[in-house]
Amino acid sequence: MSALKTHIAKVAAGTALSFEEAREAFDIIMSGDATPGQIGGFLMALRVRGETVSEISGAVATMRAKMLRVEAPAGAIDIVGTGGDNSHSVNISTGSAFVIAAAGVPVAKHGNRGLSSLTGAADVLIALGVKIDIPPDAIGRCIHEAGVGFMFAPAHHPAMKHVGPTRVELGTRTIFNLLGPLSNPAGVVRQMVGVFLPEWILPVAETLKALGTEHAWVVHGDGYDEITTTGETQVAELIGGEIRSFTLTPEEVGLKRHTKDELRGGDAAYNANALRDMLDGAAGAYRDTVLMNAGAGLVIAGKATTLGDGIALAAQAIDSGRALQVLDRLVEISNG
């Protein structure tokens, strides 16, 4: 039970772990060979000193090696946030996933229950009637036939059972908030990742680059781990091995600026009703924010060349009724 101590001492001394050292440290943790005290000490030492790209990349490599995989069509994307933004908003990336799928791009959605919000992706999907505790082959069928499938993180990362209790006891953000969105069980190489603080935009983009991602947007908007309509969104786009940074506002793509109160969510039933209404064509802040996020997803997937084009395709996907049909089909197939 002492194998992790060397790594704890190194991090506590302010030294960064190499990719291989981080991979080894997280293998020890996720194999059940560290005590809760050691895990907690290691995670907080990383957090206080600040996690590096090599450490995040090494940890993700271990996560990916141990996860239960799902087969998804070529070109599938993920749209996911780290959580930890304490925004208590409606479910933006989950709503966007249905719109992206309705526009013809398969979505392998990875997510969890609410950690920093009242209602995470898993919570709202259950409230909508989606069955989430289904085997990998059934999830693959959902992606192929409905256009979207949901991979419940704890089911696909069973090694996380060794860190779950410690994370709950710590009650604060750790490196694991970053690892989940980077460890998609379908192995997508195109994705949008929202992060809880703007200082994590570039490190996460650099990590995705190191791990071979083809095209990604890493975003943070006005306190949200999403693209927002409440203010400015900071973006790092990774494409072709190069990273460029830019900002977005709703006005520059022809959308209205909204308030945070307009995006505030509630419990799972409240958020489920709001999501279904949005997919059914309800206008307002939720729709506009989903249009921006889904539009970006369509750019990442190569379905649209500009964000404006992506937003137009996303609007068509909602207004045609196709987005709501995707949700209904997912409910049907997941329960089949």
From Swiss-Prot:
Its cofactor is Mg(2+). Pfam families: Glycos_trans_3N (PF02885), Glycos_transf_3 (PF00591). GO terms for cellular component: cytosol. Mg(2+) 2 binds at D225, E226. It catalyses: N-(5-phospho-beta-D-ribosyl)anthranilate + diphosphate = 5-phospho-alpha-D-ribose 1-diphosphate + anthranilate. Gene3D superfamilies: Nucleoside phosphorylase/phosphoribosyltransferase catalytic domain, Transferase, Pyrimidine Nucleoside Phosphorylase, Chain C. GO terms for biological process: L-tryptophan biosynthetic process. NCBIfam families: trpD. Homodimer. This is Anthranilate phosphoribosyltransferase. It comes from Mesorhizobium japonicum (strain LMG 29417 / CECT 9101 / MAFF 303099) (Mesorhizobium loti (strain MAFF 303099)).
